[in-house]
């Protein structure tokens, strides 16, 4: 079982506005807080967002080796669409809008969002209609 994920970000305040907002609306609770970062916990798993002084670059590129994206379950299509609608006010942009919500295939109801720092999340509806 996954224990935790730690994301190093170039700007903590931007990350808190986008990733922090998303984690909280997905049910994660603030777990730890320090000058350079925060963590959120859901059950035994926690996610860390940190602006480390040891960063060697000032931007994230999901197409480089390393983390491409994080994927989260949401309850259903209605919840997913509400999150997509609200996400723009929190620094997120819908990817593949011309294929939304089936960019991952006709049996995969999901939204792909990218924040201003280039981090991608995939929101996957657990209960959703299949595209016909």
Q: For the regions a protein language model found, what residue spans apply to each?
A:
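Glycine-rich acetyl-CoA-binding "A-motif" of GNAT/NAT acetyltransferases
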Residues: 120
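Short glycine-enriched loop/turn motifs at secondary-structure junctions
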Residues: 1, 63-66, 105
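Core segments of cupin and vicinal oxygen chelate
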Residues: 8-51
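Long, continuous compositionally biased terminal/linker segments
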Residues: 42-75, 79-82
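Short beta->alpha transition motifs characteristic of CBS
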Residues: 104-106, 123-130
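N-terminal beta-strand motif that seeds the catalytic metal site of vicinal oxygen chelate
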Residues: 1-17, 70, 127-132
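Vicinal oxygen chelate
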Residues: 9-15, 71-117
């Amino acid at each position: 079982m996954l224990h935790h994920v730690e994301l190093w970000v170039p700007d903590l305040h931007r990350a808190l506005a986008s990733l922090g907002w998303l984690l909280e609306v997905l049910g994660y609770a603030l777990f730890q807080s320090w000058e350079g970062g925060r963590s959120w916990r859901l059950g035994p798993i926690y996610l860390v967002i940190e602006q480390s002084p040891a960063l060697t670059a000032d931007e994230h590129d999901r197409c480089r080796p390393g983390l491409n994206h994080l994927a989260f379950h949401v309850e259903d299509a209605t919840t997913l669409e509400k999150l997509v609608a609200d996400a723009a006010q929190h620094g997120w942009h819908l990817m593949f809008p011309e294929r939304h919500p089936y960019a991952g295939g006709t049996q995969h109801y999901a939204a792909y969002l990218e924040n201003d720092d280039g981090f991608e999340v995939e929101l996957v509806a657990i209960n959703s209609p299949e595209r016909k």
